[in-house]
Amino acid sequence: QKKDKKDRF
């Protein structure tokens, strides 16, 4: 799980 702007994980 990489930290993306749309993803919190």
Swiss-Prot record:
Query: What are the GO cellular component annotations?
Result: extracellular region
Q: Coiled-coil stretches, from where to where?
A: none
Q: Which residues, renumbered to this chain, carry the PTM Pyrrolidone carboxylic acid?
A: 1
Statement: the UniProt record of this protein carries the keyword Disulfide bond: no
Q: What are the record keywords, sorted?
A: Pyrrolidone carboxylic acid, Secreted
Question: The organism sits in which domain of life?
Answer: Eukaryota
What is the annotated tissue distribution of the protein whose record heads this document? Expressed by the venom gland.
Protein name per Swiss-Prot or TrEMBL: Tachykinin-like peptide-V
